[in-house]
Each structure stands twice: as C-alpha cells, then as structure tokens.
Amino acid sequence: MSKPVPDLMTNRLKLSTFKETDIPSIVSLANNYEVAKNLGRMPFPYLVKDAEFFLDKIVTTELTWKISLLDTSEMIGTIGLRPIVKDEVSELGFWYGQEFWGNGYATEAANAVIDLAFKELALLKIEAGHFLVNEASGHVLKKVGFTQTGTSLRDCMAQNKKLSHAELELKSINFVSPPAHSK
C-alpha cells in the first residue's frame, strides 16, 4: 500500500501516522505476554529493536495507524491493513495495550478503518482472523460485520507454537457504515 496514511478521527480516538518518538510507547504496550500471546507476528519479550523493525518494515509497507485517545493523545494500540490482493483485498489486524481492553476502542477504530477501506480505497473484501482462545477479538470482528469462513493453524511467535485460528471476511457489498457514535 503506497498510499499515505490519512489521519482518522472517531468520537474518542485519533488514528495517525507513527513516528520514531512512538518507540517507547510501542514497547511499553507491546511488552506484555497477555497482549503478545494473542497475536501471530508479535514476539515476546518485545524490545526496542522489535519496535524499530515494526516502524521500518511493517509501517512502511502496510497501511498502519497509531491509535491514541483523543482527549489525552496517549497511545493505546495500533490497527492496520495488510495488502493481500493489490487494490482489492487486505487483511485487518489490531492490538491494544491490556489496560485499554474492554472499552470499545477496538470496535470504534475498526469501524473507522473499514469505512475508509471500502469507501476511499475501494477494497472489495477485508479478511481478518483471531486465535480461537482470543474470544474478545472474535467478538470485535463479528460486531463490525465479519463472518467466519473457516479455521486454520497459525504460528504464534510469543507462544512458539501453532494455534487454532478463526478466518473471517467482510465484503464491501455487505458493509453498512456504523453511526458516528458507535463503540
């Protein structure tokens, strides 16, 4: 995805471009086994070199946003779209610091990114997934309109093993923009 990352605003969140100065916040939020054990591509422990890799290799090749609280500018997580089929299909991924779980932030940010993906980027489909043990992410994905298409085994770096993984999709023809105040 070579398009610039546009800032997105919701009622409570600002989604924006990462900067080098975000490295300490990234490490602080990501260096938590409870976070890393639910993600395929996140190592644990999560060190400064991992945040540098994230900024240099992931943020530069994927459409990735830093998620911050609108009222305090505190970083709470990240969300992004990884291209699968150029200009047609991307994969949605997100993670949040543990202290920010359960507040509806994931749903709020996902709705904003999905809306942009279908309306501005003209994607036809977005895929996503979650480890079956991570029911909270599954709930978020279903809440924003994804439907399960199957299961697979996927690597989990932090756990150093393969885990059962739900595969989901959302097609643009099935997407309904949420009200601006949804969470």
Predicted regions: what they are:
Residues 1-33, 68-183:
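Acyl-donor (CoA/ACP) binding surface of acyl/acetyltransferases
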Residues 6, 42, 63-65:
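Flexible, nucleotide-binding loop/lid elements of kinase catalytic cores
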Residues 34-55:
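Conserved GNAT-fold acetyl-CoA-binding loop/helix
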Residues 48, 57-58, 122, 179:
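Prokaryotic Sec-type signal peptides and long signal-anchor helices
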Residues 55-66:
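A short helix-loop-beta-strand connector motif used in the catalytic cores of GNAT acetyltransferases and
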